[in-house]
Curated annotation (Swiss-Prot):
Protein name per Swiss-Prot or TrEMBL: UDP-N-acetylglucosamine 1-carboxyvinyltransferase 2
Catalytic activity annotation: phosphoenolpyruvate + UDP-N-acetyl-alpha-D-glucosamine = UDP-N-acetyl-3-O-(1-carboxyvinyl)-alpha-D-glucosamine + phosphate
Chain's gene name: murA2
UniProt lineage: Bacteria, Bacillati, Bacillota, Bacilli, Lactobacillales
Pathway note: Cell wall biogenesis; peptidoglycan biosynthesis
Binding site for phosphoenolpyruvate: K22, N23
Length: 419
């Protein structure tokens, strides 16, 4: 069993570069199946989710070369075969294969997706959109069968009942090679959606409105190869900004797009965090006094649900009482009992997280229950006095590229141990 050992209480300094966006690349890789030639992605993060996606692509017949942060995929050999259940079940973003396989073959046999357990994340919105485009859905054991019964998937006017990044991207990808026009209303607006649309348009798609709540896709017959730069990971950037404010004595975070983090930065400024925003970087100063605030997550451009857990350790340094309300994922509270083990004055009351600061954290044995909870525990371990041991670290490695090396370069006493 692998674990992370941290000897905390040491102020960090230096510079850390943000990697490419996990939430983009997990959708970009499956979308490449639609291309008729080689596609190259630059800025691909070295995370285990990427390794899993590469393995799935190779099992399906794609030729893949991955060197440094450059990923080259030739999808011409991809075959219409049932997808490997084991890998699919471990990867929530595997549902992005639905849209790309439907767009290319008009059918798909896939296992139901896995990933972090954050409460209900139904794929009903995806399936409702596919059905509007002529797809029939059936189930056999642990597999889901999607088929157009030999017909070409067709365009449709689709209204998303709730704002969903995954359903918006999946529908957009499927519609790219559909017959006719597709309109998605109440679409999600996240930067990762724009990134996927940019890749597809560079491959020859006709997509307008990505980043707004109405996206229009005019189907095309062929998509060609291209080269694409993955956007920076705004969640990784936010994690390091919060970490820098919590335990830093001057840290510069580079490869940052400020416009993707405006709501997050605004809440930090409300706390009293001192920082300087540069063209593609943010310098976080050593902090003095901070005040407690209330966080309420909402769809982009609101406060990202993926950032409420990584921010929590910093909130524990603030003076006063505050609350965290996650309106997106109701079970995103699993980091709370782990932080309590470390001495945090924090609890869950009526589905809301309530904290009283400042809390003095001490090292403890804790368990990462999901990706962003794991990030919170790493920051808490760096803040705490003494030794912190984090288990279940596979969640952390799913989404944070080279996290041990990056933190070590800032001066952290942190190790990944193989038991």
């Amino acid at each position: 069993m692998r674990k992370i050992i941290i000897n905390g209480g040491k102020a960090l300094s230096g510079e850390v570069a943000v990697s490419g966006a996990k939430n983009s690349v997990v959708a970009l890789i499956p979308a490449i199946i639609l291309a008729d030639d080689i596609v190259i992605l630059d800025g691909v993060p070295a995370i285990s989710d990427v390794d899993s996606l590469i393995e799935i692509m190779e099992l399906m017949g794609a030729t893949v070369n991955y060197h440094g942060d450059t990923l080259e995929i030739d999808p011409r050999g991809v075959q219409d075969i049932p997808m490997p259940y084991g890998k699919i079940n471990s990867l929530r973003a595997s549902y992005y294969f639905y849209g790309s396989l439907l767009g290319r073959f008009g059918q798909a046999v896939v296992g139901l997706p896995g990933g972090c357990d954050l409460g209900p994340r139904p794929i009903d919105l995806h399936l409702k959109a596919f059905e509007a485009m002529g797809v029939e859905v059936s189930y056999e054991g642990e597999n889901m069968n999607l088929s157009t019964n030999g017909q070409k998937i067709h365009g449709a006017h689709i209204y998303m009942d709730t704002v969903s990044v995954g359903a918006t991207i999946n529908t957009m990808v499927a519609a790219t090679k559909a017959q006719g026009k597709t309109v998605i209303e109440n679409a999600a607006r996240e930067p990762e959606i724009i990134d996927v649309a940019t890749l597809l348009n560079n491959m020859g798609a006709h997509i307008r409105g990505a980043g707004t709540d109405i996206i229009t896709i005019q189907g095309v017959q062929k998509l060609h190869g291209t080269r694409h730069q993955v956007i920076p990971d705004r969640i990784e950037a936010g994690t390091y900004i919060a970490l820098a404010a919590a335990i830093g004595k001057g840290i510069k975070i580079t490869n940052v797009l400020y416009e993707h983090l405006e709501s997050f930065i605004a809440k930090l400024e409300e706390m009293g965090v001192r920082m300087t925003v540069e063209e593609d970087a943010i310098f976080v100063e050593k902090q003095e006094s901070l005040k407690a605030i209330t966080i309420k997550t909402s769809p982009y451009p609101g406060f990202a649900t993926d950032l409420q857990q990584p921010l929590t350790p910093l909130l524990l340094k603030a003076d006063g009482r505050g609350t965290i309300i996650d309106t997106i994922y109701e079970k995103r509270i699993n980091h709370v009992p782990e932080l309590m083990r470390m001495g945090a004055d924090i609890s869950v009351i009526g589905g809301q997280i309530v904290y009283q600061g400042p809390s003095r954290l001490t090292g403890a044995q804790v368990k990462a229950t999901d990706l962003r909870a794991g990030a919170a525990l790493v920051t808490a371990g760096l803040m705490a006095e003494g030794k912190t041991e984090i288990t279940n670290i596979e969640f952390i490695l799913r989404g944070y590229a080279s996290i041990i090396a990056k933190l070590t370069a800032l001066g952290a006493d942190i190790q990944l141990i193989e038991d």
